Amino acid sequence: GETEKATDYLRFYSSQRLLGEHVPYAIEAWPEGNQRHLSAESGLYCRIITEGMFGIRPTGLNSFVFTPRLPQEWDHMNLRKICAFNQVFDIEVKRLGDQLQVAVIADGKTISNRKIKEGENIRIKF
């Protein structure tokens, strides 16, 4: 729902927390001396992209539903080499006017290639 607001927070978080001041993982895993700790945040950061921006939700061992949320100032976004649902696949999202062109590609074959309205779900079964 709040793609633009979420993108602003993601941009701020990325610049301050992930790209800003921190120490190597070996130190962060044992944060003595009040060192910043990123180990848990690193894993959760990926979920912002996969579950938030791409809206990926598993529906079975070989299937999922996703709802891409492309920020207004972006013209495209891609996830490459996703290893899930017993497949390795890509998701490509491009803005075409007021619609999104969304492709899912596995092993060089197009599984789905559709134009959708913002907020529309796409179901994929491998």
Where do the language-model regions lie?
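Non-catalytic C-terminal accessory modules of carbohydrate-active enzymes
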Residues: 1-126
